[in-house]
Amino acid sequence: MSSNTGGSDRELRCSFCAKGQDEVKRLIAGPGVYICDECVALCNEIVAHEDAGEREEMDRLLTPAEIKARLDEYVIGQHQAKKILSVAVHNHYKRVFYAEALGGEVELEKSNILLIGPSGSGKTLLAKTLARVLKVPFAIADATTLTEAGYVGEDVENILVQLLQNADYDIEAAAKGIIYIDEIDKISRKGDGPSITRDVSGEGVQQALLKIIEGTEANIPPKGGRKHPQQEFIRMDTSNILFILGGAFIGLDKIVDQRSGGGSMGFGAKVSNRKDRPLGELLDQVHPNDLVKFGLIPEFIGRIPVVTHVDELGEEDLIRILTEPKNALVRQYQKLFELDKVTLRFTANALKSIASQAIERKTGARGLRNVMENVMLDIMYSLPTLEGVKECIINRAVVEKGREPVLIYDTEAKTGS
């Protein structure tokens, strides 16, 4: 392969390895460059190796300790719940990954999980973080919006539609995803006995959820159920979808306390003060019968073998949530200020006041953002118009009384009035 330019012969060479055209089988020309067949093969090998490495990292089954360590990066406290979740999730995906190797010798059941705990204690965050760590599609549903098919409200199949959409319509990926259903305690049946009227948003929803939670071939409408009745349905196997169900279950502790003797009545009965027994201790002792008495049907409870609880967050927990996780609120605001070349600092008392306000609102960790937004609104509104500010200090007076922050300039310190 030679090229004549202006009557002179010039040997062409690979722009990458510098081998001449006579040393290789083929030389491919580009705009001002050449690449030989050997370099093309080497590039393909490098790309294939990197892709295989990425797939291996993605497909490798994390150990329970590795899963918990990843959860620790984003979720403060709740160590027992994280340990139980890590083991359950590890066993679930072990069942998924090694299904063929197991054959028909032993049938491993799904490790669906029930998370009990007050609002703002981190139930949703735990489920979200698990999906992020495992790199699987994730969907959240609110149980209070669900009804039986044919009634006003969301069909349970719409949960699967959302998961499929979040998986970019990759049915294989969606079939190994995680679905978190919040407020599951709100679909408890009304009364202890079977209802003579149709309970379409309570026991009826539990019945509708049974099959997809256990594992079934579900027909789902890719565009949602009721607005597009003529669409073709997609079949999705839910056998390998991990379901995490969460709820506050207010009053469940009293049921446990009564069963375990704390609510004894009658002559000679030992009088026990409910306040003497911590909430966490009672929730550690939850039995399936307690959940039945609360209002979940036995068949539904049978599909959720793993039950754990998250503790109510105290002031110290909330302060740690503000500052320690990778996506901590304080870090987020500091990064925003850093883009304006300003250092943002919170005093210890300011953080304590923010946590205290969230506790007063009874919103837990979820309320921290709302408190922070209220505190930072005026500061973030005026800061871009101020020149020469190099540091902004948020103290207790800013949080509790709405005072201006301490602003430190390049040449002088100025304290807001």
Curated annotation (Swiss-Prot):
Binding site for Zn(2+): C14, C17, C36, C39
Function comment: ATP-dependent specificity component of the Clp protease. It directs the protease to specific substrates. Can perform chaperone functions in the absence of ClpP.
Entry binding sites for ATP: P118, S119, G120, S121, G122, K123, T124, L125
UniProt domain ClpX-type ZB: residue ranges: 2-55
InterPro entries linked to this entry: AAA+_ATPase, ATP-dep_Clp_protease_ClpX, ATPase_AAA_core, Clp_ATPase_C, Clp_protease_ATP-bd_su_ClpX, ClpX_bact, P-loop_NTPase, Znf_CppX_C4
Organism: Nitratidesulfovibrio vulgaris (strain ATCC 29579 / DSM 644 / CCUG 34227 / NCIMB 8303 / VKM B-1760 / Hildenborough)
Record GO terms (molecular function): ATP binding; ATP hydrolysis activity; ATP-dependent protein folding chaperone; protein dimerization activity; unfolded protein binding; zinc ion binding
GO biological process terms, semicolon-separated: cell division; proteolysis involved in protein catabolic process
Keywords of the record: ATP-binding, Chaperone, Metal-binding, Nucleotide-binding, Zinc
GO annotations of cellular component type: HslUV protease complex
The gene coding this protein: clpX
Record Pfam families: AAA_2, ClpB_D2-small, zf-C4_ClpX
Protein name: ATP-dependent Clp protease ATP-binding subunit ClpX
Family the entry assigns: Belongs to the ClpX chaperone family.
Assembly behavior: Component of the ClpX-ClpP complex. Forms a hexameric ring that, in the presence of ATP, binds to fourteen ClpP subunits assembled into a disk-like structure with a central cavity, resembling the structure of eukaryotic proteasomes.
